Amino acid sequence: MSGQSLTDRITAAQHSVTGSAVSKTVCKATTHEIMGPKKKHLDYLIQCTNEMNVNIPQLADSLFERTTNSSWVVVFKSLITTHHLMVYGNERFIQYLASRNTLFNLSNFLDKSGLQGYDMSTFIRRYSRYLNEKAVSYRQVAFDFTKVKRGADGVMRTMNTEKLLKTVPIIQNQMDALLDFNVNSNELTNGVINAAFMLLFKDAIRLFAAYNEGIINLLEKYFDMKKNQCKEGLDIYKKFLTRMTRISEFLKVAEQVGIDRGDIPDLSQAPSSLLDALEQHLASLEGKKIKDSTAASRATTLSNAVSSLASTGLSLTKVDEREKQAALEEEQARLKALKEQRLKELAKKPHTSLTTAASPVSTSAGGIMTAPAIDIFSTPSSSNSTSKLPNDLLDLQQPTFHPSVHAMSAAPQGASTWGDPFSATLDAVEDAIPSLNPFLTKSSGDVHLPIASDVSTFTTRTPTHEMFVGFSPSPVAQPHSSAGLNVDFESVFGNKSTNVAVDSGGFDELGGLLKPTVASQNQSLPVAKLPPNKLVSDDLDSSLANLVGNLGIGNGTTKNDVSWSQPGEKKLTGGSNWQPKVAPTTAWSAATMNGMHFPQYAPPVMAYPATTPTGMIGYGIPPQMGSVPVMTQPTLIYSQPVMRPPNPFGPVSGAQIQFM
């Protein structure tokens, strides 16, 4: 038989379906393959015994179930697996086996399938008997003799007389069961029995070491014992001498099958004079006549016997010391490898973090090192040159925050880098800042009053500061109009001259689009006169003047002719401002714009110009007819369509409108 049988595969598949990994591993460890259980399966089962959530009785029952198989291979491998777990597994496993009344009932096992089955069945019966005795020994003394502490302060050397006389016979029974295996080197012909013999060999070495230490302790206390205790002790010692001979034969078989000679201990026989001294002492206690012997001679004989047995014990423990040393070296090698791996990981982590942290610093290091120190609390400097940052990020050889605008004038003289933000001339500084945002201009009066006359003109001025370059106090705060509101309402109403001056240094939001044509700087531009029938012209101011005139607000009077009753039919006689009467479709709801309340009015039906005025930029309402416009929040998107400015001279909110 070689390899796993079909029955083994079916059984393993059944356990896979049921989800029992332990039973599946037991099945794989005890297949029909003529070889010892595989190490990977044994290691897995050992680990299972160390897990608290593994059912130890279920594991043991699985092994017991495999011993009921008719094949000697399966039964033998089941016993080997059980023995391996008893020696190397968790102590819970052997505790459970010791608590059972019966373990392996294989005293009548016989495999009649072949000649090899007959031969192996004999060793199976002997092997099962030893495992049963091993479990019984654990039940009696509550510890495993192969795992007890050995040496001068070991368990067997420090045991008292009463307990010692009860414990040593238990060791003798277990040793007898082990030596009853009685295998020859010629019978170790397959891997299964070889695996069992190796486990028995290790148990024999450890068990005899404990046995030897118990005998040493017994001899040291023999001459102080009572008569009954001396009689029991003498009988134990005689059995010990007999078993030493059998143990020597067992070790010879181990040497013949190829076990290293260094792993086999040397057994030193005690002198024969010791047995005579023990018998004479017992006879003296019983009152028999013995030959004269001094206490000094007895002590000398006893010391010689103890030293010889102690040397035997040292030779027996030599294997364990080598195993211990090998285990320690292996653990040290693993620990060293783990330390090296950990040091490599720690060496990589700081390097990565430092590189990551240093990247932005190294990128901007040049700018940080070359940037001049700026004192924001310094007083304005009287230097005649403008401060310029030497670090040009884009190599454009210009100030870093220099605004890119058309016709930008130079910065004024006498200005520091940032100026004094806490100076007393904040108002003048605010007026001197270029108006880049139409909603950030300073209010010069009451917002509810009519628009001042000086708002209509664009004063000719040169900006005293550029954006983020510096703030210098201006001696005179000149009121100016917003750069975004380029509509001249006063000139349309006829209250002021139409001469305007274009600010060449201001910010051009629309790039010169929809602005009045300028002949030259500081040169007034008269408003072109258009025929009455042409509402829209190429000039923005003229177009607005015509549109406002058509709305009927050019005369500056307020229409208060509100009627609460149904008006009668009126005949229109015409006039310069006559328009066809068209019923209003809807009225705009009163809205608040910049804190100012304007009354309602209904826009008449008229032709809108192709381009919307740029005056009310930010109130983005598309021109639509027959619907109520929605008032939105002011924005800075200059490309949005704009709303016409409301009529500040319209009727009061809520009043009915009647057009003449």
Swiss-Prot record:
<dbReference type="GO" id="GO:0070381">
    <property type="term" value="C:endosome to plasma membrane transport vesicle"/>
</dbReference>
<dbReference type="GO" id="GO:0097418">
    <property type="term" value="C:neurofibrillary tangle"/>
</dbReference>
<dbReference type="GO" id="GO:0045893">
    <property type="term" value="P:positive regulation of DNA-templated transcription"/>
</dbReference>
<dbReference type="GO" id="GO:0030136">
    <property type="term" value="C:clathrin-coated vesicle"/>
</dbReference>
<dbReference type="GO" id="GO:0097753">
    <property type="term" value="P:membrane bending"/>
</dbReference>
<keyword id="KW-0832">Ubl conjugation</keyword>
<feature type="modified residue" description="Phosphoserine">
    <location>
        <position position="315"/>
    </location>
</feature>
<dbReference type="GO" id="GO:0016197">
    <property type="term" value="P:endosomal transport"/>
</dbReference>
<dbReference type="GO" id="GO:0060586">
    <property type="term" value="P:multicellular organismal-level iron ion homeostasis"/>
</dbReference>
<feature type="compositionally biased region" description="Polar residues">
    <location>
        <begin position="556"/>
        <end position="566"/>
    </location>
</feature>
<dbReference type="GO" id="GO:0046579">
    <property type="term" value="P:positive regulation of Ras protein signal transduction"/>
</dbReference>
<dbReference type="GO" id="GO:0006898">
    <property type="term" value="P:receptor-mediated endocytosis"/>
</dbReference>
<dbReference type="GO" id="GO:0032050">
    <property type="term" value="F:clathrin heavy chain binding"/>
</dbReference>
<keyword id="KW-0217">Developmental protein</keyword>
<dbReference type="GO" id="GO:0048813">
    <property type="term" value="P:dendrite morphogenesis"/>
</dbReference>
<dbReference type="GO" id="GO:0030097">
    <property type="term" value="P:hemopoiesis"/>
</dbReference>
<feature type="modified residue" description="Phosphoserine">
    <location>
        <position position="303"/>
    </location>
</feature>
<dbReference type="GO" id="GO:0010629">
    <property type="term" value="P:negative regulation of gene expression"/>
</dbReference>
<dbReference type="GO" id="GO:0016188">
    <property type="term" value="P:synaptic vesicle maturation"/>
</dbReference>
<dbReference type="GO" id="GO:1902993">
    <property type="term" value="P:positive regulation of amyloid precursor protein catabolic process"/>
</dbReference>
<dbReference type="GO" id="GO:1903077">
    <property type="term" value="P:negative regulation of protein localization to plasma membrane"/>
</dbReference>
<dbReference type="InterPro" id="IPR008942">
    <property type="entry name" value="ENTH_VHS"/>
</dbReference>
<feature type="modified residue" description="Phosphoserine">
    <location>
        <position position="20"/>
    </location>
</feature>
<dbReference type="InterPro" id="IPR045192">
    <property type="entry name" value="AP180-like"/>
</dbReference>
<dbReference type="GO" id="GO:0030132">
    <property type="term" value="C:clathrin coat of coated pit"/>
</dbReference>
<feature type="cross-link" description="Glycyl lysine isopeptide (Lys-Gly) (interchain with G-Cter in SUMO2)">
    <location>
        <position position="238"/>
    </location>
</feature>
<keyword id="KW-0254">Endocytosis</keyword>
<comment type="function">
    <text>Cytoplasmic adapter protein that plays a critical role in clathrin-mediated endocytosis which is important in processes such as internalization of cell receptors, synaptic transmission or removal of apoptotic cells. Recruits AP-2 and attaches clathrin triskelions to the cytoplasmic side of plasma membrane leading to clathrin-coated vesicles (CCVs) assembly. Furthermore, regulates clathrin-coated vesicle size and maturation by directly sensing and driving membrane curvature.</text>
</comment>
<dbReference type="GO" id="GO:0007611">
    <property type="term" value="P:learning or memory"/>
</dbReference>
<feature type="region of interest" description="Interaction with PIMREG">
    <location>
        <begin position="221"/>
        <end position="294"/>
    </location>
</feature>
<dbReference type="GO" id="GO:0048268">
    <property type="term" value="P:clathrin coat assembly"/>
</dbReference>
<dbReference type="GO" id="GO:0048261">
    <property type="term" value="P:negative regulation of receptor-mediated endocytosis"/>
</dbReference>
<dbReference type="GO" id="GO:1902004">
    <property type="term" value="P:positive regulation of amyloid-beta formation"/>
</dbReference>
<dbReference type="InterPro" id="IPR013809">
    <property type="entry name" value="ENTH"/>
</dbReference>
<keyword id="KW-1017">Isopeptide bond</keyword>
<dbReference type="GO" id="GO:0006900">
    <property type="term" value="P:vesicle budding from membrane"/>
</dbReference>
<dbReference type="GO" id="GO:0000149">
    <property type="term" value="F:SNARE binding"/>
</dbReference>
<dbReference type="GO" id="GO:0072583">
    <property type="term" value="P:clathrin-dependent endocytosis"/>
</dbReference>
<keyword id="KW-0168">Coated pit</keyword>
<keyword id="KW-0539">Nucleus</keyword>
<dbReference type="GO" id="GO:1902991">
    <property type="term" value="P:regulation of amyloid precursor protein catabolic process"/>
</dbReference>
<dbReference type="GO" id="GO:0048156">
    <property type="term" value="F:tau protein binding"/>
</dbReference>
